[in-house]
Amino acid sequence: MRKSTDFIANIDICKEYDARYAADEVHYETFAGLAAFFGRDMQVHWHDCFFQVHFLETGKIELQLDDQHYSVQAPLFILTPPSVPHAFFTEPDSDGHVLTVRQELIWPLLERLYPGSNLALDMPGICLSLADAPQELTALSHYWALIRREFGQNLAGREQTLALLAQAVFTLLLRNTALEDNANSGVRGELQLFQRFNKMVDERFREHLPVP
């Protein structure tokens, strides 16, 4: 199902691409797998309530990330926080991995990595080449293999293992990014307020009694 805010599609991959995983906190698919379903010319869209990582091992991407344009050769990663609009185009030789994670798993991670900052809600979108980071590429190769295995099998502790692996991938990628609290946010004002409201509800709802 796609919702629209000012004609920007909100794509919920867990429901629209594969409804079997609609309730999952972590969703994994190859880049080529999603491209076969959605196409390689992705018009501007966003993912409400989800952080997403696109990691390209091969090919090149033309990316519009909020108001910034990128033309980057693999290996690279793109990290899009909830509600950050983005669009991209790739050729058939572009492939890699896509990790979609519910914001409730990433918010605490950002608060631990950047204590006292507002990055949990104000984080900009990121596009970064990893061509000069061979150690990170080796580590990520192991993580992707583990994530793909866990996601594709119904093993004991699957949900917890996927959550930990997803947080590890985000941590590794963020270590290679110079994020500052005063960085320009890619989140539009009204969507940022909506995110703040959602986060407050998520943190406080257990403190209140249900309405009869």
Predicted regions: what they are:
Residues A131-P134, F151-L162, L173-V211:
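Short, Lys/Arg-enriched, Trp-marked, Pro/Gly-tolerant hinge/linker segments that flank
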Residues D67-P81:
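Short acidic-glycine-tyrosine-enriched beta hairpin
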Residues E62-Q64, T80, H86-E91, H97-V98:
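Short beta-strand His + acidic residue motifs that chelate non-heme Fe in jelly-roll/DSBH
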Residues Q52-F55, E136-Y143, L165, V169-L172:
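Amphipathic, well-ordered alpha-helical segments in soluble domains
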Residues K60-E62, H69, P85, D95, ...:
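Structural motif
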Residues R2-E25, F89-G152, R175:
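A hydrophobic/aromatic-rich effector-binding and dimerization subdomain
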Residues M1-Q64, Q68-Y70:
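Generic protein-terminus/edge-of-domain signal
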Residues V53, F77-L79, V98-T100:
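Conserved hydrophobic/aromatic beta-strand scaffold that supports enzyme active sites
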